[in-house]
């Protein structure tokens, strides 16, 4: 194949929502700033309105949505070589989503992505493109085929990032006898799984290509893809972290934390339309503990990687009824209640997201997909009272077909300490990292929220969904919400500002991002903008205070669930590593698909209030804000 093609190109595809690692965890403890290895956003995004004006593109038509998408890529990038990624699907709105990866000399350009959205009419609806358009090598420069090269790349990654893996005895084994570009690195210690190395191209921030080894290492707090220069393994061009960290909230669904309600016994809470085997089966086995098709929950006091044999409650007759009070101490005395709460919240959210469109085809987390598309064997590993850290939580999202991993820690900012499993918003926030990473760029690509701005939006989507599900019947647009207030023992929460539609209470606007360089801060701006959109839709359509949406012709009948649905659909439409403007446009297009555009003005007004109006411009250093809305929205105000 392409041997140790240590030639001139490197690629780094953004995979998973990369959240800022708090200063007490993972590589940050070792003085490594992973944010310094991020790539810039580079995707172009053509929305439906632009596609309609391009007669050549709008004329493309076929009953086969993959064929139409392929023809589009050939038209837009006639000189490029590429391959079809095997995660295309038709979503519940009838839109087909197709994903392509650029190749050069037979080697993937890891951040060369092209996503195409095909409407129900068999025509192109919108598309995103981050293909490399500059010079490409005529052939890969080969070096002596030395099988130690992947090992040298591993050593380079370990040294540059201070990754605590011992690799003195590491040896490279090809994953396929005919493939000399993809290796498993045996003989290491300190990782949760054997590291791997794959030869890929990467587009660097200066637009040039570099040939790199994509070295994958999982040490728990950080699950990294490190792009090591193939010719000089002391150079690292880009780092992707599958683990998204955060800080945040549960009891009955909708109760944010123990201050809002009491424990109560709930019977058979699952929905058989979304969890057809209930929460305790997988189609072949019925379990009497917290194991099922959607997840596996257990305690993990040591913080280790093993979980299958960890402790789980196993009550008689599936009666998971355990006492808990925030005054109980130490946390280990209520571990049964903690696991049960985490299990309930994660499964409930799985079912809600399924109703909103995050199903097997689009890459959700299930062991048995029951012939509904996508790749199975990717339940969520749910670790309660995880001993690998404190005052945090995180979620790791590998591509479809590999389990997600949620780790929930004890928080020590109150006395007695507080268990984050009882704060619903934290569970939702973390799980939403899995949602946003699987939908953006396609289920097979968890690297599409890896740039600084897109990674920040990853935090924002997580905060948005966590806030939306906690709304109360008496809430209005004047209701403010903090994030993580209970677990942090701080009424202001863990964000700079509470979420509010009041510009004095929360003054964040689009151009605020010009002065920010940390993903949670950027995410707070994005979630603030979405909070405005949420209330505009609620004011128009009302608010369903029930735990599940009601639909009419596939459209949620109320504003809260409609907002969640449009944001979710926008994730599937937007390009890999989007910026604020592109993500805004994807939500607007999602409304055109779902409702025929009946909510365009409500959306525009929400965006424009926070400077993301029609005149907003994106530049990584000088974003330009705009409070303008389309003329029709001004006429009918």
Swiss-Prot record:
GO biological process terms held by the UniProt record = proteolysis
Question: Any note on cofactor binding?
Answer: Binds 1 zinc ion per subunit.
- What name does the UniProt record give this protein? Extracellular metalloproteinase 10
**UniProt keywords, alphabetically:** Glycoprotein, Hydrolase, Metal-binding, Metalloprotease, Protease, Secreted, Signal, Zinc, Zymogen
Q: Name one GO molecular function term.
A: metalloendopeptidase activity
Residues at which Zn(2+) binds: 429, 433
Q: So where's the catalytic machinery, residue-wise?
A: 430
């Amino acid at each position: 194949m392409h041997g140790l093609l240590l030639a001139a190109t490197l690629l780094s595809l953004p995979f998973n929502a990369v959240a800022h690692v708090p200063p007490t965890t993972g590589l940050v403890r070792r003085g490594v700033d992973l944010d310094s290895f991020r790539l810039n956003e580079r995707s172009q995004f053509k929305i439906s309105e632009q596609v309609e004006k391009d007669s050549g593109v709008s004329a493309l038509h076929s009953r086969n949505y993959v064929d139409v998408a392929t023809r589009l890529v050939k038209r837009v990038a006639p000189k490029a070589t590429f391959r079809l990624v095997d995660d295309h699907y038709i979503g519940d709105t009838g839109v087909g989503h197709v994903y392509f990866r650029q190749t050069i000399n037979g080697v993937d350009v890891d951040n060369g992505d092209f996503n195409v959205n095909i409407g129900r009419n068999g025509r192109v609806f919108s598309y995103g493109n981050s293909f490399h358009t500059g010079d490409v090598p005529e052939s890969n420069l080969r070096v002596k085929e030395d099988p130690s090269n992947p090992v040298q790349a591993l050593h380079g990654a370990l040294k540059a990032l201070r990754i605590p893996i011992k690799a003195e005895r590491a040896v490279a084994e090809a994953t396929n006898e005919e493939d000399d570009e993809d290796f498993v690195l045996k003989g290491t210690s300190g990782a949760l799984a054997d590291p791997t190395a794959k030869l890929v191209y990467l587009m660097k921030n200066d637009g040039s290509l570099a040939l790199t080894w994509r070295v994958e290492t999982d040490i728990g707090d950080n699950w990294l893809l490190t792009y090591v220069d193939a010719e000089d393994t002391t150079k690292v061009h880009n780092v992707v972290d599958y683990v998204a960290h955060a800080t945040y909230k549960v009891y009955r669904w909708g109760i944010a934390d123990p201050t809002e309600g009491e424990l109560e016994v709930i019977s058979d809470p699952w929905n058989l339309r979304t969890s057809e085997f209930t929460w305790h089966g997988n189609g072949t086995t019925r379990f009497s503990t917290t194991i099922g098709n959607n997840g596996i929950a257990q305690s993990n006091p040591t913080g280790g990687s093993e979980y299958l044999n960890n402790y789980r409650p196993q009550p008689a007759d599936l009666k998971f009824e355990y006492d808990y009070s925030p005054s109980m101490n130490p946390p280990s005395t209520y571990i049964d209640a903690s696991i049960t709460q985490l299990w309930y919240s994660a499964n409930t959210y799985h079912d809600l997201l399924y109703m909103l469109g995050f199903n097997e085809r689009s890459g959700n987390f299930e062991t048995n997909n029951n012939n509904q598309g996508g790749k199975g064997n990717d339940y969520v590993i749910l670790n309660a009272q995880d001993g690998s850290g404190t005052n945090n939580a995180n979620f790791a999202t590998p591509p479809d077909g590999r389990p997600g991993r949620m780790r929930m820690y004890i928080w020590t900012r109150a006395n007695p300490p507080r268990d984050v499993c009882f704060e619903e918003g934290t569970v939702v926030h973390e799980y939403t990292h899995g949602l946003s990473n699987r939908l953006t760029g396609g289920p097979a690509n968890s690297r599409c929220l890896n740039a600084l701005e897109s990674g920040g939006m990853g935090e924002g989507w997580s905060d948005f969904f966590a806030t939306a599900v906690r709304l109360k019947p008496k809430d209005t647009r004047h209701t403010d919400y903090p994030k993580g207030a209970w677990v942090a023992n701080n009424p202001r929460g863990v964000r700079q500002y509470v979420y509010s539609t009041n510009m004095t209470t929360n003054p964040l606007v689009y151009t605020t991002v010009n002065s920010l360089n940390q993903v949670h801060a950027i995410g707070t701006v994005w979630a603030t903008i979405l909070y405005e959109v949420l209330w505009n839709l609620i004011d128009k359509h009302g608010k369903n205070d029930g735990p599940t949406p009601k639909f009419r012709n596939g459209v949620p009948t109320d504003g809260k669930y409609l907002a969640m649905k449009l944001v979710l659909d926008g994730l599937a439409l937007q390009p890999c590593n989007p910026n604020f403007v592109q993500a805004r446009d994807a939500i607007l297009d999602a409304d055109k698909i779902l409702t025929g555009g009946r909510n365009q003005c409500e959306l525009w007004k929400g965006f424009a209030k926070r400077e993301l109006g029609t005149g907003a411009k994106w530049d990584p250093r000088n974003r330009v804000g705009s409070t303008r809305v389309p003329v029709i929205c001004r006429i009918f105000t």
